[in-house]
UniProtKB/Swiss-Prot annotation:
Lineage, broadest ranks: Eukaryota, Sar, Rhizaria, Cercozoa, Chlorarachniophyceae
Protein species of origin: Bigelowiella natans
Biological role stated in the UniProt entry: Produces ATP from ADP in the presence of a proton gradient across the membrane. The catalytic sites are hosted primarily by the beta subunits.
This protein's record includes keyword rRNA-binding: no
Protein name: ATP synthase subunit beta, chloroplastic
Gene name for this UniProt entry: atpB
Membrane topology: Peripheral membrane protein
Length: 477
């Protein structure tokens, strides 16, 4: 490791110019980390080199606040990119972009670190099989299945169950796939990060006393952080996820909340560095930066990283360059509906609004595809009839339409499911439902075999056996 020392020459917000001796410039690389240190001020600020300007100067972006930094302060060249700890010792811990724990639980007992800037896996190492990633959540597995090693966009406003869905996915991947999860909080509210951590402890996703039972690592670069930290925190989390995939040979779930903030931070940094803006004021390197992050999220022959990314759409404009660039990388979309949440149907996943490239007969098989299409057709017809029902009432419908409405209401309720992580709120035992059980149950409803059942028998149950048991209880009462 080289430790050539330079001096701070200019400070413009989070952008800092540094001068090194001319003989030290040969060892300076783009994306290397440098540390501004001042013992009298008790100051240590890490910056990342972004540009080489002139024969002796570099332009850097700070990863933390630049308060109290003065011209003439010493800068130590590390000779390497920002590196973060990796491995099992990171589970249940919260880190910042530099891989430093911020949860007041002491240092991480870990010797291995990895630089956050890494190239995507080589083409020959990729696993190109089209394989469904079973989540155990009926509505997702049936209507908008995830691809193993794929990327999913999660769309939903406040209070519709996004956090609970994320926690259930973390819980299910640990139980069904023996995998772990990494959560990247990119530019979101500090309160939300704190609430998520508290809820994970309450629901058992994080077990404070037992490292091996904990299933998640959290990396936060929140809204109050400088743009450099928000731009790099996604890469820090991805580096930790890559280690679990490559070394532990596990299926890993990577959550990014919110991928728009990653683009937004890149836009801020680009403007601060004086680059000419592109469309709508975004950075000219938008597609390159997004590709650099997304192409590392993939399946290899060792394991997979399946990514679920919350996507904020500015002003609901799907043509916004940030949203449009993100959509190009997604394999599936999971849309959460406030209308379903208001009916108490959880998970409030919109069965008609959610999509997946995996829902093709040659990938999922004919029986799965046909069942999903029939479910969607039934729900679509119910949606079309709702205005007529509201004005004229159910009695004015034809016999066939009344049957469709009855089955659609049963399907709507059967798409709900009790979650393991919500047991403490609902008092109902969580259910993991296999894909075959899901298809069997919905086919039974569609065929008319269960027309005599009360629709409440299908509400918040797992498989068809649970619905039959609930119907028996309803009949007895």
């Amino acid at each position: 490791m080289t430790t050539n020392t330079g001096k701070v020459t200019q400070i413009i917000g989070p952008v800092i110019d540094i001068t090194f001796p001319i003989e030290a410039m040969s060892s300076v690389n783009i994306y290397d980390a440098v540390v501004i240190e001042d013992k009298t001020e008790k100051l240590s600020v890490t910056c990342e080199i972004q540009q080489l300007i002139g024969s002796q100067s570099v332009r850097t972006v700070s990863m933390s606040s630049t308060d109290r930094i003065k011209r003439g302060m010493d800068v130590v060249q590390t000779g390497t990119a920002i590196a973060v700890p990796v491995g099992k010792s990171t589970l249940r811990r919260i880190f910042n972009v530099l891989g430093q724990p911020i949860d007041n639980l002491g240092d991480v007992k870990n010797e291995e670190t990895r630089p956050i800037h890494r190239s995507a896996p080589e083409f020959v190492d990729l696993d190109i099989r089209l394989e469904i990633f079973e989540t155990g959540i009926k509505v997702i597995d049936l209507l908008a299945p995830y691809r193993r090693g794929g990327k999913v966009g999660l769309f939903g406003g406040a209070g519709v169950g996004k956090t609970v869905l994320i926690m259930e996915l973390i819980n299910n991947i640990a139980k069904a796939h023996g995998g772990v999860s990494v959560f990247a909080g990119v530019g979101e509210r500090t309160r939300e990060g704190n609430d998520l951590y508290a809820e994970m402890k309450e629901s058992g996703v994080i077990v404070e006393d037992n490292l091996l039972e904990s299933k998640v690592t959290l990396v936060y670069g929140q809204m109050n952080e400088p743009p450099g930290a928000r731009m790099r925190v996604g890469l820090a989390a991805l580096t930790m996820a890559e280690f679990f995939r490559d070394s532990s040979k596990q299926d890993v779930l990577l959550f990014i909340d919110n991928v728009f903030r990653f683009v937004q931070a890149g836009s801020e940094v680009s403007a601060l560095l004086g680059r000419m803006p592109s469309a709508v004021g975004y950075q000219p390197t938008l597609a390159t930066e997004m590709g650099g992050l997304q192409e590392r999220i993939t399946s290899t022959k060792d394991g997979s990283i399946t990514s679920i990314q919350a996507v904020y759409v500015p002003a609901d404009d799907l043509t916004d360059p940030a949203a449009a660039t993100t959509f190009a990388h997604l394999d599936a979309t999971t849309v959460l509906s406030r209308g379903l949440a208001s009916k108490g149907i959880y998970p409030a996943v919109d069965p008609l609004g959610s999509t997946s490239t995996m829902l093709q007969p040659w990938i999922v098989g004919d029986s799965h595809y046909e069942c999903a299409q029939k479910v969607k057709q039934t729900l679509q017809r119910y949606k079309e009839l709702q205005d007529i029902i509201a004005i004229l009432g159910l009695e004015e419908l034809s016999e066939e339409d009344r049957l469709t409405v009855d089955r659609a209401r049963k399907i709507e309720r059967f798409l709900s499911q009790p979650f393991f992580v919500a047991e403490i709120f609902t008092g109902l035992a969580g259910k993991y439902v296999g894909l075959n059980e899901t298809i069997f149950g919905f086919n039974k409803i569609l065929s008319g075999d269960l027309d005599s059942y009360n629709e409440q028998a299908f509400y918040l149950v797992g498989n068809l056996t649970d619905a039959e048991g609930k119907m028996k209880t309803i009949s007895e009462n």
